[in-house]
Amino acid sequence: MVSKKDKQIHSDHNPQDASPVEWAEIRHKLLAFQENIQSGSDIDARSDDPQMCGLYVSDIYEYLRELEVKPKLRPLHDYIEKIQEDITPSKRGVLVDWLVEVAEEFELVSETLYLTVSYIDRFLSLKMVNEHWLQLVGVSAMFIASKYEEKRRPKVEDFCYITANTYTKQDVLKMEEDILLALEFELGRPTTNTFLRRFIRVAQEDFKVPNLQLEPLCCYLSELSMLDYSCVKFVPSLLAASAVFLARFIILPNQHPWSQMLEECTKYKAADLQVCVEIMLDLYLSRSEGASKAVREKYKQHKFQYVAAIPVYQELPVTFWEDVVTI
């Protein structure tokens, strides 16, 4: 869904309106980009999917990287300590795990779930919420996200029903209004899911044939990280890169999970990901406290290649955090 602001950006950069000097600069940049297509960028250029926007992908992801760090679109990393009194990391985890189940029940696209959690964290960074209303914040945030992403979205009554009618239709609509006002209607933002699609495509290049477990395993690790409050501090692109790193390690434990191509694509070195990857590994091994029952059950299904049940080493070799060496 394209916002008015995005439309304005596109209209302001119409090549037909450019002066000869501006057009020469645009043409120079495009030629330079085409001459330098290699590694991860080459994958985008080879894609026959018009939605992948191969020619413009570098500019698009550069814009998304700028957008993901905008203060207005980021939650406080310590909002539970600074803003909340009744809410704890554990209660937040229970809510998010339940919302994973709700998203499955309503057959929502994955981006709706990611946006929902983003809205919850941003709202709780601004407003103190009583524990009794936390579930209402969750379903109202999902109601907003479903309007933004879904072609056929659930009705307000469906969200009331899923809470066993703990809240009324008026409660949900009022909380929807409160969330929208608090977020100043800034609803579009990149999520972990935004970056995963491209990172996974690059990560598949090392396999002779596409690995069927890689994508669902990356998604599983990303959803586990959504449950964990300590991951709120990480930007979406870093979470996505960390999920790919750990997924590759789980699938091929004797091979270095990172590569020159992935480093170029993600803009992260292996060492940049260490803290986040180790948290994800703890979550995967259930060494961290937190509710993840719904997420684990979801990814134990055949349609997700049973990735929640893949065995893994207890820790990663120290050498995996060193810079990738090109041979």
Swiss-Prot record:
<keyword id="KW-0195">Cyclin</keyword>
<dbReference type="InterPro" id="IPR013763">
    <property type="entry name" value="Cyclin-like_dom"/>
</dbReference>
<dbReference type="GO" id="GO:0051301">
    <property type="term" value="P:cell division"/>
</dbReference>
<dbReference type="InterPro" id="IPR036915">
    <property type="entry name" value="Cyclin-like_sf"/>
</dbReference>
<dbReference type="GO" id="GO:0044772">
    <property type="term" value="P:mitotic cell cycle phase transition"/>
</dbReference>
<protein>
    <recommendedName>
        <fullName>Cyclin-A3-3</fullName>
    </recommendedName>
</protein>
<dbReference type="InterPro" id="IPR046965">
    <property type="entry name" value="Cyclin_A/B-like"/>
</dbReference>
<dbReference type="InterPro" id="IPR039361">
    <property type="entry name" value="Cyclin"/>
</dbReference>
<dbReference type="InterPro" id="IPR048258">
    <property type="entry name" value="Cyclins_cyclin-box"/>
</dbReference>
<dbReference type="InterPro" id="IPR004367">
    <property type="entry name" value="Cyclin_C-dom"/>
</dbReference>
<keyword id="KW-0132">Cell division</keyword>
<dbReference type="InterPro" id="IPR006671">
    <property type="entry name" value="Cyclin_N"/>
</dbReference>
<keyword id="KW-0131">Cell cycle</keyword>
<dbReference type="Pfam" id="PF02984">
    <property type="entry name" value="Cyclin_C"/>
</dbReference>
<dbReference type="GO" id="GO:0016538">
    <property type="term" value="F:cyclin-dependent protein serine/threonine kinase regulator activity"/>
</dbReference>
<comment type="similarity">
    <text>Belongs to the cyclin family. Cyclin AB subfamily.</text>
</comment>
<dbReference type="Pfam" id="PF00134">
    <property type="entry name" value="Cyclin_N"/>
</dbReference>
